[in-house]
Amino acid sequence: MRILLLTLVILSGNTMANTVEEPTWELIEQIDAVELRRYGATIEARTPLNSSRESSGGFRRLAGYIFGGNDSGKEIAMTAPVGETLVPENPVMSFTMPSEYSMNDLPAPQDGSVSLHTVPERTIAAIS
């Protein structure tokens, strides 16, 4: 079982949980405040970060995509969590796309630094 240790998962609060879709997951194990979760396959919009501290620019680029900055001008619902992969030489921010979409249904991003990726089922460590 692969565990993605370098992924920081930013979890939404209770108020967002009622209005924002989250990927389905099952709890595998809890170790103190850390949960090992098995997530199903998803699609992510991703953008590189200039550094591991540049999350606001990445968030703006991804928000631009879901708020109509795409080849159809279509708005896409916000989901949770927002992900940051904090590998020093290649940090990335990602938004999970709503489950109603397939890769064929999603409009292409207008911003060349935003790309779409199929993410297979995976195990993630999350701070609960």
Regions found by a protein language model. Give the residues of each.
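Sec-dependent N-terminal signal peptides
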Residues: 3-12
